[in-house]
């Protein structure tokens, strides 16, 4: 398992593809798995890697809380696609790994059991929370105006970046380009959110993080369903 070398474009592409249908490296909440991979990435992925950049900006917002995130941090080779081998940090990192060898045995098995138990507990909590939810879930329909920098902005790519944002309780709907003047068009896109899971502040933070394409975001309409 792994992402290849996360300090290279090829490794970041693997990460981007892996996150195309995921919000986090593992599970439904930020965890030490995200911290481990985040720390292996040397900086923000390029704007054309929408999924990786969206994930990077989101995990970066947990900088102060990363030590308290759930889970047990493992080596990079424990995460990612099973068909890819981790090669991040070869050389000096390999020497460090040699220094960390435990000549009197290993507690990897114990850590694995602990991680497994933690995952099972989180899954049980998640299922319990789902079971206790009321039959009627409060939802809202939101119409967003996403404005580009100028008339040369690739609006197809901008929309792709916006739709790459995924979250539990968020469903993207129809969209269209609306002229605003001087040859510039804004993206007007509909979404339905579960009120207790997704807010406009979260949407604005993640959409404007694609700063190579997005100048600003406004809520054009907000209706309770």
From Swiss-Prot:
PROSITE patterns: EF1BD_1 (PS00824), EF1BD_2 (PS00825). There is a cross-link at residue 147 (Glycyl lysine isopeptide (Lys-Gly) (interchain with G-Cter in SUMO2)). Transmembrane segments: none annotated. Keywords: Acetylation, Elongation factor, Isopeptide bond, Phosphoprotein, Protein biosynthesis, Ubl conjugation. Residues 73-115 are annotated as: Disordered. The modification Phosphothreonine is found at residue 88. Residues 96-113 have a biased composition (Acidic residues). SMART domains: EF-1_beta_acid (SM01182), EF1_GNE (SM00888). Phosphorylation affects the GDP/GTP exchange rate. GO terms for cellular component: endoplasmic reticulum; eukaryotic translation elongation factor 1 complex. InterPro entries: eEF-1beta-like_sf (IPR036219), EF-1_beta_acid_region_euk (IPR018940), EF1B_bsu/dsu (IPR049720), EF1B_bsu/dsu_GNE (IPR014038), Glutathione-S-Trfase_C_sf (IPR036282), Transl_elong_EF1B/ribsomal_bS6 (IPR014717), Transl_elong_EF1B_B/D_CS (IPR001326). Residues 2-90 form the GST C-terminal domain. One of its GO terms (biological process) is response to ethanol. It comes from the Eukaryota. CDD domains: EF1B (cd00292), GST_C_eEF1b_like (cd10308). The modification N6-acetyllysine is found at residue 7. GO terms for molecular function: translation elongation factor activity. The modification Phosphoserine is found at residues 42, 83, 106, 174. Belongs to the EF-1-beta/EF-1-delta family. PANTHER family: EF-HAND AND COILED-COIL DOMAIN-CONTAINING FAMILY MEMBER, ELONGATION FACTOR 1-BETA. EF-1 is composed of 4 subunits: alpha, beta (alpha subunit of the eEF1B subcomplex), delta (beta subunit of the eEF1B subcomplex), and gamma (gamma subunit of the eEF1B subcomplex). Interacts with elongation factor EEF1A1. Catalytic subunit of the guanine nucleotide exchange factor (GEF) (eEF1B subcomplex) of the eukaryotic elongation factor 1 complex (eEF1). Stimulates the exchange of GDP for GTP on elongation factor 1A (eEF1A), probably by displacing GDP from the nucleotide binding pocket in eEF1A. This is Elongation factor 1-beta. It comes from Mus musculus.
């Amino acid at each position: 398992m792994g992402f290849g070398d996360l300090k290279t474009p090829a490794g970041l592409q693997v990460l981007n593809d892996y996150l195309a249908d995921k919000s986090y490296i593992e599970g439904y909440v930020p965890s030490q798995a995200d911290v481990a991979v985040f720390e292996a990435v040397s900086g923000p992925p390029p704007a054309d890697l929408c999924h990786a950049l969206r994930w990077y900006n989101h995990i970066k917002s947990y900088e102060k809380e990363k030590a308290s995130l759930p889970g047990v941090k493992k080596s990079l080779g424990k995460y990612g696609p099973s068909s890819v081998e981790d090669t991040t940090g070869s050389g000096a990192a390999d020497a460090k790994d040699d220094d960390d060898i435990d000549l009197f045995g290993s507690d990897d098995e114990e850590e694995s059991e602990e991680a497994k138990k933690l995952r099972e507990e989180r899954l049980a909590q998640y299922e319990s929370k789902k079971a206790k939810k009321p039959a009627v879930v409060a939802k809202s329909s939101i119409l967003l105006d996403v404005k580009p920098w100028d008339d040369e902005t690739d609006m197809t790519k901008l929309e792709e970046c916006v739709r790459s944002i995924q979250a539990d309780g968020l469903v993207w709907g129809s969209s269209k380009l609306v002229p605003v003047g001087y040859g510039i068009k804004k993206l007007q896109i509909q979404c339905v959110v579960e009120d207790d899971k997704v807010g406009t502040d979260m949407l604005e933070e993640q959409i404007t993080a694609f700063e190579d394409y997005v100048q600003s975001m406004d809520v054009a309409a907000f209706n309770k369903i």
